[in-house]
UniProtKB/Swiss-Prot annotation:
It comes from Kineococcus radiotolerans (strain ATCC BAA-149 / DSM 14245 / SRS30216). This is Ribosome maturation factor RimP. Residues 177-208 have a biased composition (Acidic residues). InterPro entries: Ribosome_maturation_RimP, RimP_N, RimP_N_sf. Residues 175-208 are annotated as: Disordered. One of its GO terms (biological process) is translation. Pfam families: RimP_N. Belongs to the RimP family. GO terms for cellular component: cytosol. Required for maturation of 30S ribosomal subunits. It is found in: Cytoplasm. The keyword Cytoplasm applies. Keywords: Cytoplasm, Ribosome biogenesis.
Length: 208
């Protein structure tokens, strides 16, 4: 007998299928159903369909929420009990576990965890059937910096050798100036962090 999570996933899969109203733009990532008192809480994670980098906008999440709610109500999979629906996009801490995840992370700094227990920091350049292709980055890994000759060197990671990837938060990406961040409407948080760091540096100089 399928679990409730599996039953809800079965109901929602056609909603996000290719050719459906929202299936061309959105993909179903995860479904979980929990109980909170007398209510059930249905959490649905959706992402942009396809493998192109980019963020999911609020209008798309709202459209997904409407479609999911209608499908759940029509199916009766949750019975007569009231439920709360939460539809969201994956957070930056979502592990990269599929080729589509990795492809959508092109250009990002990622900590790649390998099957031999080691981890590497790579800038993802491209993704194909063979695996992930990137360049090594100079950040510390397990307390040891990579050798100078390896920094920026191409690194290919086969799918069989990859366990997961973890996207790293960057205050300023390579070649990106503060002026570039200002031009980006979504960069306000990054600018705030940069200002705070500058204030801390100024305070240290005053104390000296």
């Amino acid at each position: 007998m399928p679990t409730l999570d599996e039953a809800v996933t079965t109901v929602l899969t056609p909603v996000f299928a290719a050719g459906s109203e929202i299936g061309a733009d959105l993909a179903l990532e995860e479904v979980s159903v929990t109980t909170a008192g007398r209510r059930q809480v249905v959490r649905v994670v959706v992402d942009r369909a396809g493998d192109e980098p980019g963020d999911l906008d609020l209008d798309a999440v709202a459209a997904a929420s409407t479609a999911v709610s209608e499908a759940l109500d029509e199916s009766g999979v949750l019975g007569e009990a009231p439920y709360t629906l939460e539809v969201s996009s994956p957070g930056v801490d979502r592990p990269l576990t599929t080729p589509r995840h990795w492809s959508r992370a092109r250009g990002r700094l990622v900590r790649a965890v390998l099957t031999d227990g080691t981890a590497l920091l790579v800038r993802v350049v491209s993704v194909d059937e063979a695996g992930v292709h990137g360049t090594l980055e100079p950040q510390m890994v397990k307390g040891k910096p990579p050798r100078a000759k390896d920094v920026g060197a191409p690194r290919d990671l086969a799918w069989a050798d990859l366990v997961r990837g973890e996207v790293q938060v960057e205050f300023r990406r390579p070649g990106e100036d503060v002026e570039d961040l200002v031009a980006d409407p979504g960069a306000d948080d990054e600018l705030d962090e940069l200002d705070e760091l500058d204030e801390l540096d100024d305070g240290d100089e005053d104390e000296q």
